[in-house]
Amino acid sequence: MSAAVSRHISVLGREAVEFLAPRAGGIYVDATFGAGGYSRRILAVAGARVIGIDRDRTAIAEAFDLVEQAEGRLTLVQDRFSQLDEVCASQNAPQVDGIVMDIGVSSMQLDRAERGFSFRQDGPLDMRMGQEGASAADVVAVASEKDLANIIYIFGEERHSRAVARAIVRARQEKPILTTKVLADIVASVVHTRPNDIHPATRTFQALRIFVNEELDELQSALHASERTLKPGGRLVVVTFHSLEDRIVKNFINARASRGGGSRHMPDVERTAPSFEILTKRPVVADENEIAANPRARSAKLRAAERTANASHDADTSFDWPTLRTVMKGGRA
């Protein structure tokens, strides 16, 4: 096992697996495998089987020791977690007993400068979790000023998004923006923070990472796939790290835990009956001890729900945010 893997600490790991309630003979999906923290806890239950999914081939490769230790109870698949229903079907597990997902970038990726996720270490401006498709450098080079401002405002919730976008466009006219340090310095030149505030580039880097990896689209699709894949009584556990993700999870679970509205023309039918029962009336957060040991846990929120026997609801595929395909196709304005 590599040093990077051994250093990684799963956020809210104990709570997540308690809600998952693994048992012997059950099949569980660690939909964002990373360093396998949740998988290890599930595999500690004798007879439990895990299907681990990660789009990062490095995460899959570095889990070789854990696969061997699991003695056939852990299967790893390199894929997007939005495809978890198809992955499970390919592993002869079209219905599973539980799904856990930890949304966002892993500390393994942040710690490696060559992955280009962190403004604290200089490296290529990449940010791709799966090393395919457009990189952050590509987006910064091609996107129009308007698109950049929208991306940074929507996905980073950065109130200085227009100033940041202008600064990026101005800088790229001089020379390409190819490294994390160069971009961080550009952002810091227009976003001024107090000494105890977060780094001025934090929100811009978050926005680009979410956009490049289509994380919100992936999350929406993964939630719908989970609804289709869980057995009645199966549990969904999701850990998020910022308000955009948490809002999506909260709205999804709440919508599916209530009966769809009917009318005198179309009364409620079985397909709109609740497909989930909420297990966490309020999100679970990390305690002081976990935050002290792992500062990343400070912003974490855990939500959990249990699948009912009712049919899945229709998937909501209408997204009101910029998409990678549209922005890269449109180019500079």
Swiss-Prot record:
<keyword id="KW-0963">Cytoplasm</keyword>
<feature type="binding site">
    <location>
        <position position="102"/>
    </location>
    <ligand>
        <name>S-adenosyl-L-methionine</name>
    </ligand>
</feature>
<dbReference type="InterPro" id="IPR029063">
    <property type="entry name" value="SAM-dependent_MTases_sf"/>
</dbReference>
<feature type="binding site">
    <location>
        <position position="54"/>
    </location>
    <ligand>
        <name>S-adenosyl-L-methionine</name>
    </ligand>
</feature>
<protein>
    <recommendedName>
        <fullName>Ribosomal RNA small subunit methyltransferase H</fullName>
        <ecNumber>2.1.1.199</ecNumber>
    </recommendedName>
</protein>
<comment type="function">
    <text>Specifically methylates the N4 position of cytidine in position 1402 (C1402) of 16S rRNA.</text>
</comment>
<dbReference type="Pfam" id="PF01795">
    <property type="entry name" value="Methyltransf_5"/>
</dbReference>
<feature type="binding site">
    <location>
        <position position="109"/>
    </location>
    <ligand>
        <name>S-adenosyl-L-methionine</name>
    </ligand>
</feature>
<dbReference type="GO" id="GO:0071424">
    <property type="term" value="F:rRNA (cytosine-N4-)-methyltransferase activity"/>
</dbReference>
<comment type="similarity">
    <text>Belongs to the methyltransferase superfamily. RsmH family.</text>
</comment>
<dbReference type="InterPro" id="IPR002903">
    <property type="entry name" value="RsmH"/>
</dbReference>
<keyword id="KW-0489">Methyltransferase</keyword>
<feature type="binding site">
    <location>
        <begin position="36"/>
        <end position="38"/>
    </location>
    <ligand>
        <name>S-adenosyl-L-methionine</name>
    </ligand>
</feature>
<keyword id="KW-0808">Transferase</keyword>
<keyword id="KW-0698">rRNA processing</keyword>
<feature type="binding site">
    <location>
        <position position="81"/>
    </location>
    <ligand>
        <name>S-adenosyl-L-methionine</name>
    </ligand>
</feature>
<dbReference type="GO" id="GO:0070475">
    <property type="term" value="P:rRNA base methylation"/>
</dbReference>
<dbReference type="InterPro" id="IPR023397">
    <property type="entry name" value="SAM-dep_MeTrfase_MraW_recog"/>
</dbReference>
<keyword id="KW-0949">S-adenosyl-L-methionine</keyword>
<dbReference type="GO" id="GO:0005737">
    <property type="term" value="C:cytoplasm"/>
</dbReference>
